[in-house]
Design a protein with these regions (language model features):
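Cofactor-/ligand-binding subdomain signature composed of acidic, glycine-rich
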Residues: 1-44
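Gly-rich Lys/Arg/Thr-decorated short loops/hinges at beta-loop-alpha junctions or inter-strand turns
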Residues: 21-26, 79-91, 194-199, 241-247
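Ferredoxin-type iron-sulfur electron-transfer modules in oxidoreductases and energy-metabolism complexes
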Residues: 29-44, 73-75, 81, 90-95, ...
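Conserved phosphate/anionic-ligand binding catalytic regions in large, soluble enzymes, centered on
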Residues: 47-67, 166-178, 182-184, 350-362, ...
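Short acidic, glycine/serine/threonine-rich loops at helix termini
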Residues: 56, 62-64, 88-91, 130-135, ...
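Histidine-anchored nucleotide/phosphate-binding helix
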Residues: 98-112
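Short amphipathic, charge-patterned alpha-helical segments
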Residues: 105-109, 256-274
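Hydrophobic alpha-helical positions that pack around
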Residues: 130-256, 272-274
Length: 451
């Protein structure tokens, strides 16, 4: 059984309220942190090996250490709660049921970074959660954990909740900052990075909800103890949003030492696939990471078990692996159509493109049109090659990662399921009434000729 750090008290009735949260050890980590020097907390976070839980997996302590500290210039912490990645909902769970865990993490993080004004930028579709957060903020303020001279330390902190307007692109940190400043959420060119020139041109750290919440157990048990949980550079625990064709969808906390097979089939987690269906494929890190077929999901190309951690999921690169991403674990059974699924994702990314970069603005539209054509039984064999060519023109040629996020699902679908795409082209009428089923996987590593 995985060790619980973030969700250990999630089952307790009323845990979202200050009194109950406090009764079960809440804000003890904050009290401990406020007696430490900011640089000591930073070292604990570095020692813990905590990596950003929003998708990129960049070391949190290192990111904090980049924060510029010019004399007399305010600094800010911004929590990225614009959780809009299809298949990802773990941050929503934290904010809805454990809002004080996030606020405590923000208090510790803001104290470490020297931010006296911090923000939570929340996805517009989470319309009911800002009220929960604002109530928790008022409770914390009434108890002396927010506001002026917190616990007599001389440290001041105000936290504000800002609602987004439903744009996926605002999950990109610089687009988020643009929106927070009241402008259209278009990503900025980097450098300068937010740590140097962020919100209102001030040094700013932007972190994911789960990343900030994880600071609380790091201070509770110490960075060294936190680093012992997990394996290698995948330290601590990770929240996984499990959905799709599984018996037990939901949010699970894992310590990243379990195998993918155990996560899917164990009763402790997903509980297997309904109705005894076969596993066809999985997207383990949210819609933007490469889809992998069952034969490469449960084992690596070398035949070793694949584990639920950053390194193991990425084993083999994009040729045979994928990414941990945001932890949006989407399972597809044998009845699912990969062409239809890829088309749905392409439609999403085309709709959510901000339009600033031509490769993304035009490319996502054309990928959706071609996939729709193939899915309707009107495609030609050259359309598959055209799709491949378009995604190559998008990847790496945009200001922000949305272009890559749109290209990777298409590339992986063609790489691993080309036979299914060809079946749609060769069987236009049949493809409208039945699905292809389990793919006839080709060897993803073609043999190299010695001639």
């Amino acid at each position: 059984m995985s060790k619980k750090l973030l969700l250990k008290n999630a089952h307790i009735e009323g845990i979202r309220y200050f009194e109950t949260y406090r009764k079960h050890g809440g804000y003890e980590a904050a009290e401990k942190a406020l007696k430490m020097k900011p640089e000591e907390i930073l070292e604990e976070v570095k020692t813990s090996g905590l990596r950003g839980r929003g998708g990129a997996g960049f070391p949190t302590g290192m990111k904090w250490s980049f924060l510029a500290k010019p004399e007399g210039v305010p600094r800010h912490l911004v929590v990225n709660a614009d959780e809009s990645e299809p298949g990802t909902f773990k941050d929503r769970y934290l904010m809805e049921f454990l809002p004080h865990l996030l606020i405590e993490g923000m208090l510790i993080s803001s104290y470490t970074l020297g931010s006296n004004t911090s923000y939570i930028y929340i996805r517009g579709e989470y319309s009911w959660i800002p009220d929960i957060l604002e109530e928790a903020i008022e409770e914390a303020k009434a108890a002396g954990f927010l506001g002026k001279n917190i616990l007599g330390t001389g440290f001041d902190l105000e936290i504000y909740v800002q609602r987004g307007a439903g744009a996926y692109i605002c999950g990109e940190e610089t687009a988020l900052l643009e929106s927070l400043e009241g402008r259209r959420g278009n990503p900025r060119l980097k450098p300068p990075f937010p740590a140097v020139k962020g919100l209102w041109e001030r040094p700013t750290v932007v972190n994911n909800v789960e990343s900030i919440a994880a600071v609380v157990p790091i201070i509770e048990i110490g960075g060294a103890e936190y680093a012992k949980i997990g394996v290698g550079r995948s330290t601590g625990t990770k929240l996984i949003s499990a959905c799709g064709n599984i018996n037990k969808p939901g949010v699970y906390e894992i310590d990243m030492t379990i195998t993918v097979e155990e996560f899917i089939y164990s009763d402790e987690y997903c509980g297997g696939i309904p109705n005894g269906k076969k596993l066809k494929a999985c997207i383990p890190g949210g819609s933007s990471v490469p889809i992998v077929p069952a034969n490469l999901l449960l084992k690596t190309i070398n035949g070793e078990p694949r584990y639920m951690n950053y390194e193991s999921l990425a084993d083999g690169g994009f040729a045979t692996g994928t990414m941990m991403g945001s932890g949006g674990f989407i399972v597809l059974d044998e009845d699912q159509c990969v062409v239809n699924h890829t088309m749905t994702l392409a439609r999403f990314y085309n709709h959510e493109s901000c339009g600033q970069c031509t490769p993304c603005r035009e490319g996502t539209g054309w990928m959706y049109k071609i996939l729709k054509k193939i899915e309707k039984g009107e495609g030609k064999m050259q359309d598959i090659d055209l799709l491949w060519d378009i995604q190559r023109k998008i990847e790496g040629n945009t200001i922000c990662p949305l272009g890559d996020a749109a290209a990777w699902p298409v590339a992986a679908a063609i790489r691993h399921f080309r036979d299914e795409f060809e079946w749609h082209v060769n069987n236009p009428e049949l493809s409208q009434t039945q699905n292809y089923g389990i793919a006839n996987y080709a060897d993803p590593i073609p043999a190299v000729s010695n001639s």
